[in-house]
Structures are given as C-alpha cells and as structure tokens.
Amino acid sequence: KIGVFLDGAFVDVTHLDPGEDLSLGHLPQGQVDGVLLAGSGDWDTGIAEMLRTRSKGGVTEIKHGDPHPLTTEVEHPGSLGTDRVANAFALQSEMIQGLEQSKVWMIVDVGTCVTTDVVCDGLHLGGSISPGLSMRINAMRDGTAALPGVEKEVWTKLAPFKGETIGKTTQEAIIKGAADGISAEIIGRWEILNEQFRDEEVVGVILTGGDSSLLELGRVMPKFADSNLTLKGYYAIFSHIQLSSNI
C-alpha cells in the first residue's frame, strides 16, 4: 500500500495485490521529497535501493522493534507492531478529523489479525490482538474433519454482514460465525471500555484495515472509518523523524 502526501495532506493511495512486487510503475511520476518504507516484516534491500532512485531525500526505513515516537503505557514499546504504532500515532498527531467527539478512542484494525488500541487524552494505553476473518475461517477448515474451506472471494461477496445472523448453509454458518464473532467482540470491548471510562466520555471507535468494511457494529457511537489511518500515522512518524533530525 502506497500513500502520497503533499504539504502534509493525504492526496493518493495505491493498493498492491497480495504477492505483487513493488515497482517504479506504482510510484508517482518524477522525484519526491522523501520516502518512508515501513512494515512489520522484512523486505529485500533492493526495494529501498529502487526507491532511492526516485527520492530527493533518500529512504527512511522503519521495522518492527525500531524506536518510535508513540507515547504509550505498554510495558515494552518496542514490541508493538508498526501498524499499531502508526494507527495510535495518527491520533496523537491529530492527523484525522472528528477526534473532538470523545477523549477516549478505540482503534480497530481489521486485517490478518484484529487489533484494538485504546488512546485516552492522546496517551496510548494498550490494546488487544485476535484472529482476523481469514484466519478464523481457515482455522475451522484446518482444525476439523468435515468443515469446508471458504475462499475470500466468496465471503467478501456477502459483505457487509448486516441483519440476519443465521446461516442457512454450512458455508454461510462459517462466514456468519467468523464475521459476527468479530463484530460481537468489538462491541463487547466497546461496552467494557465505556464502563471503565464512565467518568470520562462515551468511547469512540475508529475502524480501519482491509476487512473493516465487512463488519456491522450497529449501536456503537461515535464511530467512523478511515481506510488510510495507518498511512497517515506513518506520515506523522516520518515527519517527526525528519523534524528531529533537523534539530
């Protein structure tokens, strides 16, 4: 996923298919002022070398375990995944609008895993990690003798998962069990947080991640979705690094 920012504003995004290699054709035309290459996994050194050919300011790399500017209460800040850091730092840096609706926010990133991160008055408190939709559906296939696999192309066509929660076929039951389970998990966490922060304000929810649009959270309010939240957080981290290096 490639995000482009101009004068601090998000202007464009390019999505790569799973397994698709990054190439110069995915990048904006001409030279850019700087590049941030970030992620929790490893990548070939040739990627950074390729990006340097299009960047006036070189390439900054951030990997899992690297120091980061997020203000957090977790015991081991370096153990946080880079996407979780970016999501929370987007809020700390006020990279998104609408945060005035609450002092307490739960960020829900629905991808390979479902991560939640709680930010209160700009401080990251921690969160949770659980299996994502594909992982849940595949686990039912791999862990049983009779349940079938369901390809992502099939269950995404049934999205969003609203209304009827009863599957009429085994395939529907698997999909609804996985999807409704995630929705119920998120709603349940939201209710627990509202009890925990009952002396503050109603907890807000920000949805992001590739599968976030497939869920139905019903009565959860305030809530909004930002599919580019992680990119905005990475940009905020990049700006912080650039500013710190110029001091």
Question: Where would I find each of the regions flagged by the language model?
Answer:
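Glycine-rich phosphate-binding loop plus the immediately following alpha-helix
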Residues: 86-101, 125-175, 237-243
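Adenine-nucleotide phosphate-binding core of ATP-dependent small-molecule kinases
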Residues: 14, 159-203, 222-223
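Gly/Thr-rich phosphate-binding beta-strand-loop-beta motif of the actin/hexokinase/Hsp70
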Residues: 1-11, 91, 101-124, 140, ...
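N-terminal glycine/serine-rich phosphate-binding loop of ATP-dependent small-molecule kinases
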Residues: 1-68, 201
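Short glycine-rich, Thr/Ser-proximal phosphate-binding strand/loop in the N-terminal lobe
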Residues: 1-31, 123-146, 160, 164
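Conserved phosphate-binding/catalytic loops in two-lobed NTP-binding clefts
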Residues: 56-70, 219-235, 243-247
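Glycine-rich phosphate-binding loops at beta-strand->alpha-helix junctions
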Residues: 37-46, 197, 201-222
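Glycine/small-residue-rich loop that forms an oxyanion/phosphate-binding "nest" at active or ligand-binding sites
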Residues: 51-93
